Structures are given as C-alpha cells and as structure tokens.
Swiss-Prot record:
GO molecular function: DNA binding; transposase activity
Organism: Burkholderia multivorans (strain ATCC 17616 / 249)
Organism lineage: Bacteria, Pseudomonadati, Pseudomonadota, Betaproteobacteria, Burkholderiales
GO biological process: DNA transposition
Keywords: Transposable element
This protein's name: Insertion element IS401 uncharacterized 12.4 kDa protein
Disulfide bonds: none
Gene3D superfamilies: Winged helix-like DNA-binding domain superfamily/Winged helix DNA-binding domain (1.10.10.10)
Tagged with keyword Metal-binding: no
Family the UniProt entry places it in: Belongs to the transposase 8 family.
Top-level taxon: Bacteria
Amino acid sequence: MNKTNKFSPEVRERAVRMVQEHRGEYPSLWAAVESIAPKIGCVPQTLLDWVKREEVDSGQRDGLSSSERERLKALEREVKELRRANEILKTASAFFAQAELDRRLKS
C-alpha cells in the first residue's frame, strides 16, 4: 500500500539542509529538529527520519541507503513471487505425476 507524501522532495531537502546548517546552534540534533519542524509544518520525528536518511545516503551514518533499501524491497518482492511460482510448479508436478501413475496402473 502506497502512502501519499505530504511534503515534496524539495521541501524535505530544504528542511534537512536547515537542520544541518543550524545544528551547531543547538545542544543536540533533537533540539535542532524540534525547533525547525514546526516551521515547515511536520512533526519532529518525521524531520529526524529525513535527516537520518540523508546522513545514511551521504555516508555519514551506517545503514542502507535509499537506493539500497529500494533494491532490497524489489528483491524481496521478486523472491516472494518466485516462491509462489515454485509452489504452483510443485503442485502441478505432483498432480501430473499422480496422473501418470494412474495412467500406468490402468494400462
């Protein structure tokens, strides 16, 4: 299920940039986020998530980058689909094997 993004990528980038630029003026990252989030109209946790994601994407923080995360999701979907196809093939194989066995027994 896809959710609609309330904030455009430009707004997100600008908000993250504001946090990064003003981070030194606050005692912690959270304090900077709490101060800036109301100015753009989002909750602090959302802005913190954006900042952390940007830090991961730029290599400043450990974790999967956005592109790696998207690739992982695509691979997980593919694995799920392949497993489903494999189950269908197993069922069909068992069906045809039984049909062949029945045919041989009748002959």
